[in-house]
Amino acid sequence: EWAKKLYIKAESKAEQINDFSGLADSIHDNLEDKEWATKLYKITETKCEVAEEFSDLAVKIHGRLSDKEWAIKLFKITESKLEGGENDPGETLADSFRYFGDNISEILGDKKWAEKVYKKSEENATYKNELEYLAGSVLDHLEDEKWANLIEQKAEELEDDE
């Protein structure tokens, strides 16, 4: 009961996306209160702005709440933001697409969607390392050796990253 009081106090002081998201995680994991966690994840969603935030929340929603439909909705927002050129902070657009493709494959198991996203990563790749990492993702997640080799060949044609 005292833990619940602490969480109520923490919720009253929460302001930022990570406050609400972390609190929801903790309430779900420690109090096993799915309803309260869901409420906090909904608040978190209203605070999401960039692709990475929507994608990270989708992973949590799927993992902790097992809500595939909500996760798909958030992943679609992620894709829309990336297609609009909004890459994740500190990442290139090609890497943002690759990370997103990895999530689609790992979380949803949707290989067709992941392939579509990886193609966008390849289209946006301008650096050798982007293509090398993408080749690894294509091999690991799609098990497409032929495509991975083609991406590797493309990477070899580029100069080393400066």
Where are these regions (language model features)?
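Alpha-helix boundary/N-cap detector
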Residues: E1, N18, E35, E49-E52, ...
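Alpha-helical repeat scaffolds
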Residues: W2-E11, K34-E45, E69-K81, D110-E122, ...
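Structural register within alpha-helical repeat arrays
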Residues: A10, L23-I27, L57-I61, L93, ...
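Generic helix N-cap/helix-start motif at coil->alpha-helix transitions
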Residues: A14-G22, C48-D56, P89-R98, A125-E132, ...
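Structural motif corresponding to the intra-repeat A-B loop/turn of tetratricopeptide repeats
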Residues: N30-L31, R64-L65, I107-L108, H141-L142
